[in-house]
Amino acid sequence: MAEETAPPCGPVSTGGSLSPEKMEKRTCALCPDGHEWSVIYFAPSANIAAHENCLLYSSGLVECGPHDPRNPARSFAVKSVKKEIWRGRRLKCSLCNKGGATVGCDLSSCRKSYHYVCAKKDHAIPQVDEDLGTYKIFCPEHPPQQEETTERADSPSVKKTGKKKSLSSGPPTEPKKMKFSRFKRLMKEEPHGHKDAAVKAPFLKKCLEAGLLTELFEQILEKMDSIHGRFMDETASESDYEGIKTLLFDCGLFGDILRKFQEVIKSKTCEYEERLNQMKQKLEALADLQENLCSFQECGDLDPSGSTSGSLLPPEDHQCRCQESPEVQAGSGDSL
């Protein structure tokens, strides 16, 4: 149960357009005032709740509007939070090895990701700039520099948005407009037969330069996740089957995955065979036990009447149950 400190969440009309649905700020009624875990954000429409710090330090999540120091509530769009949760499903925590690790070390070359609570346990170093509204985490192996002027020229410049750009000490690069003009000219000069190859590689490079490559791959993975859900629900269409078949077997991109999947099949086969052997051993043990019980009955060690009755009560208990007192018999007669 939490105390509500914001109006109900939902799309808000602003001059004919809809602003993004935002998370509601709640305060845990059982936490002490001011505790870092007491502030929770909740989205009733999506049934999602998250701690404030888990949201603030998530590498791929930013607020959907400028933070107002006079308003303690944060502006987290529900759509962005759902996207970050989905992104975290593919990230394993460097400490607990479980999914959902959206808090990454802010050094671009470091691959460590945490849950916020695991980052604290691992003594990760937080870096907060209230004026800029940035919340960063550095793993213990990569403590942050005290001043930007002390960083090396080839060190990365990191932003809260999760888009990391390395500074280059090499020759100056061409402006983007010039690059794009050259790209269009090359497109016109390429023969038709090589046009597809000329388009695809530069297209992905342009996505990278525009900071949209991650967005593109996230949409691809989201599409795959949606198809996977339909397969699990047994609602997949014929086009879903054809699409996955083409992706896996026709394009050759996932040949290594199929080879690894063969190893998974072998491993599962061995696992189930081992289970089957264990079940056979248990069945044999039960059969031996039944045979021993039968031999005890033949030798008179067990009362046949007791074994056929299907009850574990001693014989005297059966007699007590069967012999009713005169009062009980009289009562039963009266009831009739």
From Swiss-Prot:
SUPFAM superfamilies: FYVE/PHD zinc finger
Region listing for Disordered, in residue ranges: 1-20, 139-179, 303-336
Protein location: Nucleus
A single Gene Ontology CC term: nucleus
Keywords of the record: Activator, Metal-binding, Nucleus, Transcription, Transcription regulation, Zinc, Zinc-finger
Chief localization: nucleus
Annotated Low complexity bias: 303-314
ZnF bounds (C2HC pre-PHD-type): 25-61
Residue spans, zinc finger PHD-type: 91-143
UniProt feature coiled coil, ranges: none
GO terms assigned for molecular function: zinc ion binding
One Pfam family this sequence matches: zf-HC5HC2H
Subunit structure: Interacts with BRCA1 and RELA.
Function summary: Positive regulator of Th1-type cytokine gene expression.
Record-given protein name: PHD finger protein 11
Gene, per the UniProt record: Phf11
